[in-house]
Structures are given as structure tokens and as C-alpha cells.
Amino acid sequence: MGIFKSIVALFTSVVMFFGTVWNAGISAVNSYSFTVDTSELGDVLVNPASNVNIWSIQGNPFVGVKINEENNIFEFVDYIQLMQCTGGNADRDLFKDPYDRTVLDDYDFTKLIENCRGIIGLGAKPMLKLGSVPLKYSAKASEDEYFGTNVYPPDDYDVYYNYIAAIAQALVDEFGKEEVLSWRFGVMTEFENSQWFMAVSGDPDESAVEYCKLYDYTVQALIDVIGEDVFVGAHAMVVTEGLWDERAFINHCASGTNYKTGEKGSRICYLAASFYDYSPGEETSGMNFEKTMKHLKNAAEKAGLKGLIFGVDEGRLLCGNTRGSSDNQLLTRTVGYTYQAAYDARIYRTMFNNNINYFSSWSFLSGGLINGNPTVSYHVASNAAKFDGAKLAETKKTYRALFPNIEVDAVSAYNEETQTVHVMAYNYKNDVDYKNTAKINFTLKVPQFDCEKVRVTAYVIDDDCNYFDEWQEDRVTYGIGDDCFDWSPDDPEIGSTTTLSAQWAREIYFNELEAKYKECSKLEPVVSEAEVKNGKVKLDIKLDPKAVVFYEITQVK
């Protein structure tokens, strides 16, 4: 026994020694080098943060709403996605009496029209998710399903077609055909998710047929009223298995027989997926983000569909690491910690490198979609949006530290019109408590520049522009425990009662803290100049853990 104890003690000492050396080593030599070459250009990039989504228009969230001038998300958000806005329960069904099955055409589109008008007034365009079938159109309909909406197809597809056509006509009458043609339309949310839609039988194959039929009737109603150029598509789960394989629908659009017209195929302009990791530190049980999107794109390419755009209609993180009084879900599907900045940056890098059009967000501000202080997600999104119109530039990692589970990476682009080089880099580990700085060196080869100096504008997104670390300290000071929250306290939308629910704590937040956090969340650029030597520009930075840096580099003449 004595020998055994001695061996254990020796082993423990060795482990502790090397653990100390390992951690010290990371801090000392966590170094990376990148080469950017703007003579090697690829695809034209688009703004990856152009979409936001909202769960419901109940309560008219866009009627009479004014732009937040200080933190205006509509400087980069182009579309507001209204999820399942034309059916599924009494709040979403657009009728005078959603429960009266004796009258099937007592339409009342006032709520939809007024909210669309409000969205346009904010400088954005509506993206309307259609497809959920009104209660009175399905004999088996129930509001007791998982999402509180009817999951079954219509009993009579012609009645449903007339409803969608009437909605389209009302929108054209109110806003004009040219305006509505600039909007986007979708048919269902996660169409192969049985919690959103399925056949009455629940059979996978029958459910696929019913959805394809629903899609065809919906799209044709839009075409017949708005025109053949209407922008319409569909949103699948993809990241995890649904009731049936989404490729059945993709193949139907490419070469199947249209259930409404009898012709070959169906109009489709975009395909979207959902992508959720479970929580910080726990990735999805399904495909990672890049594999999810490649799966969707490959399926469309194999089916022969061309010219589509690909996006993500909802996602990021389902749950936080701490639980509120009733749930650990994240209201905005993001956390307030600076970890989220690097998480978002690596998503945008994947999008730029794989020609993914957009990743829709639930919120960018502490008070909801329109109001409040900027989160780190806002700062990353607003800077990533500046890549819009630039061409992807060759970015090579020429040196990297050999430490596991740490991801330090970069992406760059060159805008030929503005003659600007854009670079984004991040220091990420899938751990909210990650604590190691990364030393990053860049060598930029920009033959387009004919100058001796360049102006470098750097935006560093770290704890210094994040109110959430101060919020954690203030929670301790004021005794605001996890039981003061309904859902996860890790969510940055403190202004929502779904997040911070205790009234006494809300009074402290709004009366004493929110104004202070305005200063804590400001992102100030740092402007400097760098020399051009032998056609190259060299930059370096020590990037804090979980932080992100954006560079904008222009000529000084």
C-alpha cells in the first residue's frame, strides 16, 4: 500500500508540474501569423447580418416604433422575418373570428398590413413566413401542440390557396406590386420538423408529400397575384434529423410534378437551415455549422437547382450555462459574455468562406429588437456587415501555436470600389472562462495600393465594450440571484421579463444601471498609420481571450 501511495503521489506531482508548464506555455507562446494577399480575390461577399427574426406580431411590435438613433440596427439589417405570420393559432390566423368554421373567408389582414408598414418605415423589408395553416382550415387542428400552432395540412387546399392569394392581393393593394416584389417570402419554419408540420397520419412519407403540396399551393398563390419574380423559398432544420429528409422537397422543386399547376418543378429562390449549438461549451449533437450548410448546398446542386441563395433563418445557442426560475433557455439564443463575440466571428468567417448569404438573429440589443444598449453580437455584426461588396482575399495561416481546442483565425477581403482592405480575426475557445491572450501578426500584400503609408482603423471587441461583465458585478452587489430570472441569466437582453423577471431587480436595472451600461458598451475605433515596405504592410495585436478585431486599411496619399 505504501508503494502504491508513493506512485500516486509522484504521478500527481508530475501532472501538476506539466499542467503548470502547459498553462504558462499557452500564455507565453500562443502566437499566430497570417498572410493576406489581395491579388488573389474570390467571391463578392454580402452582409451576413442582414436578417433578424421575430416570433410573433401579436401586440403590433412594429406599429408606431421609432428607430434607435444611437444603436440603429437598420444600418445593417435589411430584412425582418415575421415567423408564421399568417396562421396556426388564434393570434396568427388573419380572420375576424378564427374559431368560426362556418365562415372560411372572414379575412382581416389589418395586423399584418400595419406591421409591414412599420417595418418599411424603419428602413427594412418584410420577410414573411407563410404556410402554417389556420385553425378553421384543418379539422384536426389544435393549439396544444409544442409551438402552440396547428401542425396539420388544410382539409381543402383550394380554400387555403384563396386565403394566401387574398393576403398577397391585400399587400399589393396597400403597398404596390413593385414594393412587394422587393420583399421575401418563406413557406413554413423548419418544414420537416413534426413540431411545426406533418400529415394527419404522422407518416414521414405522407408528411413530405403534404408539405410539397402546401409549398406549391402557397407559391402559386403568390405568383398569381404578385408576379413570377416573387422571391420565395423554404426553411429546413438540416442540422439534426427531422421527420423526413429535406432532400425530398429539394428534389421535388427541381424535377417533381407541381401539385398546383401539374407542371415540372416549383419556383424556389432560397434555402435556409437552422443551426443551434446546445450551450457554451456543448456543441450540437448534429452536424457542425459548415457541414450543415454544405449538406444543404450539395443537395440543391445535385438536384440541379441553380442561382439559389443560402442562409440560416434561426440559430446560435439554445441554452445558457445557468438556469432561471423556470428554464435555462436563452431568449435571444446568445449569451452576454464576450465569448459570444468570438462565437459570432467564427460563424461569419465560415459564411464568407462558403458563400452563405445571411444568418438571422433574434436580437442585437439589451432591450429587444429596437431598443437598448449594444451587445457584443451587435458590434461584431455591424463590423462584419462592412465586408458587403468586397471580394474574399486569400488568407493563409503561416504559423500557429500547437495547443488543442484553441481556434485563432482570420478572414479578409478587398473592396475595389472603396479601395479598402477588411480583416477580421478572433481568439476563440469553446469555454466561457477561456483566459489566454493570442499574439497575432499579419503580413498584408496589397498590390492595389500605390502609397508609402496606410491608415489602419481597428475595432477591438472585448470586455471593454461589453456591459455584461459590469452587469455580473452589479448582480453580486445588489443580490440579484438566478431566481430573479425566468429564463437563463446568461442572456444579454436584460430588459425582457423573460430574462430578468423580478420586479424589484428590474427597477434597479432601469433606474440605476441601464444608463451606466450605455458607456460600458461603447466601441471606440483606434486609428493609426503603418508603413508600406516592399509592397507589404505588417500589423500585430495581442488579442484578449474571446475577443475579435476588425481592421479597415486604406491608402494615405
Where do the model's predicted regions map?
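Acidic-and-aromatic substrate-binding clefts and catalytic sites of carbohydrate-active enzymes
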Residues: 53-67, 104-109, 193-197, 237-251, ...
